[in-house]
């Protein structure tokens, strides 16, 4: 028999198709999905602060100071835009070219997937002078959007508890989240991200917490990666340019070790397998340095042909 799975039901039936797997990796991916929404707001210039909290019960709360998810009635769906974003796959600002110039998020499945895979999710939106709130369970709304307070702030807070009947692991690892938030701070200079773990109380009575912020972005990232190595050049080479409306940024340095470490990203997503962006960079670097060496007659005495790997 042929089954047609509607909307979020499909996510609950085949979660791995949407978030990769249902173990530790997928569990942490839920947090990245929500944080990526806030980062998209930051990249559009509307958000400067993102706060991630691991609560005592291993639920997660992510707060930002962006514009807040829209709450007005969605024309086509006839429901609040907030409910549409949280219950319809591929809904949101990143599929319309005008809203975001850059957007991350996995395959654009977005925060509706997080909702589908959580026993409880609560969205609070600060927008138009009011606090709007809606709660969900396993992707289904428990009630319509309610106005619960007045406010002069803007932003979104999403709290969610991953579904233990879907995930084989439900305990969040602080270090995994810290690594990703640190990386996001380096990739998005000027934004502040904070991680707090309410499961760990320090001696002074405060919770374990860390703030990630970088003013110099990739340049600082390279220094951080290279911090334990012996440098060959005094500072990081940093290039920022734009080609056909697409911003490109490169930071590199040389040290005395023989192993290279290369990290490439597109829209904040680590492209582990490389791609044309990395291949193009390697070609450009090789060609430029080779030409410089030839023009400066540095290669006349060399007995061997130098290759890209030599750079």
Predicted regions and their residues:
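Conserved ATP-binding N-box helix of the HATPase_c
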Residues: 25-48, 110-117
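A conserved short beta-strand within the histidine kinase catalytic ATPase domain
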Residues: 48-54
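GHKL-type ATPase core
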Residues: 1, 58-81, 92-215, 221
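Short, conserved non-catalytic motifs in the polymerase core
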Residues: 19-21, 99-101, 106, 262-272
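Bergerat-fold GHKL/Histidine-kinase-like ATPase
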Residues: 12-13, 25-31, 48, 218, ...
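Flexible hinge/switch segments at interdomain interfaces of large molecular machines
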Residues: 4-12, 55-56, 149-159, 251-266
């Amino acid at each position: 028999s042929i089954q047609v799975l509607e909307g979020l039901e499909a996510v609950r039936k085949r979660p791995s198709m949407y978030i990769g797997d249902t173990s530790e990796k997928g569990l942490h991916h839920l947090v990245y999905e929500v944080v990526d929404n806030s980062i998209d707001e930051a990249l559009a210039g509307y958000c400067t602060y993102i706060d991630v909290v691991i609560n005592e019960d291993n639920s997660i709360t992510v707060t930002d100071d962006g514009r807040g998810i829209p709450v007005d009635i969605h024309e086509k769906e006839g429901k609040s835009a907030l409910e549409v974003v949280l219950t319809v796959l591929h809904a949101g600002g990143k599929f319309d070219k005008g809203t975001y110039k850059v957007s991350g998020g996995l395959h654009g499945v977005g925060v509706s997937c997080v909702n589908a895979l959580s026993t409880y999710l609560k969205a609070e939106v600060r927008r138009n002078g009011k606090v709007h709130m809606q709660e969900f369970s396993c992707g289904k709304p428990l009630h319509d959007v309610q106005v619960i307070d007045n406010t002069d702030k803007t932003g979104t807070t999403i709290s969610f508890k991953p579904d233990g009947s879907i995930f084989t692991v439900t305990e969040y690892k602080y270090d995994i989240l810290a690594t990703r938030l640190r990386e996001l701070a380096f990739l998005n200079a000027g934004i502040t991200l904070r991680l707090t773990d309410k499961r760990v109380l320090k001696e002074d009575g405060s919770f374990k917490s860390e703030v990630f912020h970088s003013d110099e972005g990739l340049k600082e990232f390279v220094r951080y990666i290279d911090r334990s190595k012996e440098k060959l050049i005094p500072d990081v080479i940093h290039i920022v340019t734009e080609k056909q409306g697409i911003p490109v940024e490169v930071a590199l340095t040389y040290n005395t070790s023989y192993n290279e470490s290369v990290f490439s990203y597109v829209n904040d997503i680590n492209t582990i397998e490389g791609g044309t962006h990395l291949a193009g960079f390697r070609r450009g670097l090789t060609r430029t340095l080779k030409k410089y060496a030839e023009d400066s007659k540095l290669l006349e005495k060399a007995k061997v042909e130098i290759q890209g790997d030599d750079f």
